[in-house]
């Protein structure tokens, strides 16, 4: 995990976690090629990572993912996916599973 997930050249970008490592040739978080799973950050993926990291004793990393996810949605609104470099929202507006951020907020409040 430390070698890849926390690597700023792969997954640990300003608004983690991209669906493809930033070091991959096909990384396209700006959605230029209209390939949605080639780099954007998705809240449903962050939600799964958050709970998995907490379950395995990495609450510190989970909290960072939650904090950056909350900031990203606060900045760009409820969108389908986000650019992991800028936090800009892309795709559909008011996308349902992005409301999983509410679960992250509640979980973070319960651990504070």
Predicted segment positions?
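Small-side-chain structural scaffolding
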Residues: 40, 50-52, 62, 66, ...
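Well-ordered alpha-helical scaffold segments within catalytic/enzyme domains
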Residues: 47-59, 101-112
């Amino acid at each position: 995990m430390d070698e890849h997930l926390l690597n700023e050249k792969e997954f640990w970008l300003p608004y983690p976690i991209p669906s493809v490592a930033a070091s991959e040739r096909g990384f396209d978080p700006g959605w230029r090629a209209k390939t949605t799973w080639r780099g954007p950050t998705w809240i449903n993926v962050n939600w799964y990572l958050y709970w998995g990291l907490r379950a395995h004793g990495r609450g510190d990393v989970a909290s960072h993912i939650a904090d950056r996810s909350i900031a990203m949605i606060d900045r760009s609104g409820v969108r389908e996916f986000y650019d992991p470099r800028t936090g800009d929202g892309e795709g559909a507006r008011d996308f349902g599973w992005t409301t999983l951020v509410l679960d992250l907020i509640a979980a973070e409040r319960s651990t504070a």
